[in-house]
Amino acid sequence: MIEALNFKRLQEEVHDRYEYNEQCIVGIIFARYDLQHVQRIIEENYLYWNYNTKRYLDIFWAGYGEYLCPNDESATKKILKFEGNDTRIYYDLESFISVKEQFNHYLKDKDKYKDKLQLVLVNYKKGKLRFDKYISIDLEQNLDDNYKKIREIFEYITNACRNLHDVVELKERMEKDKAKRWIKGITISNVSDVINV
């Protein structure tokens, strides 16, 4: 789980984390921390997801950062409240909106962010995040008591990404496993643009 306070920083972080010729699947999660159900999901799952995904699946949190001084908390900047938040991970509403707007710039109208808890899986290839093929999951369509379905989705994707390095491979695995039967809100799209920052 990695901070993504702005799109340029996200691209730089990805570039620094991976070798130029490395290929992998990267997740970007859009989660407005000011919503009660999002707070609860993060508080109950963040540490587990962070340790469980390891290097198999890096997930960047749009609008989230680290090391906010408690005195700098405000109506738009909130330190996440979960045990083990030693780096003072925080949510920045203004940064979230900025990343969302930049993200939407690269997507067709039907695929733009629609103010819901959303996980987008993209390829990292040749030094860049690629949006020519991606998988988007509307996690809010999978809400249930204790967020069991969302936890299952993260576990499924993490396990799949141990051996898969392209969203096309993940799409094929999901089809083979008939994942659309139990995961709601999956969109698999082709977008012609590649992010160039």
Q: Which residues does each predicted region cover?
A:
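N-terminal leader/targeting and pre-domain segments
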Residues: 1-24, 149-175
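Well-ordered, non-membrane alpha-helical segments in soluble/globular domains
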Residues: 5-10, 35-49, 89-104, 143-155
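A short, hydrophobic beta-strand/beta-hairpin element that forms part of a small beta-sheet core
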Residues: 111-133
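Eukaryote-biased recognition of electropositive, low-complexity segments
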Residues: 124-127, 143, 187, 191
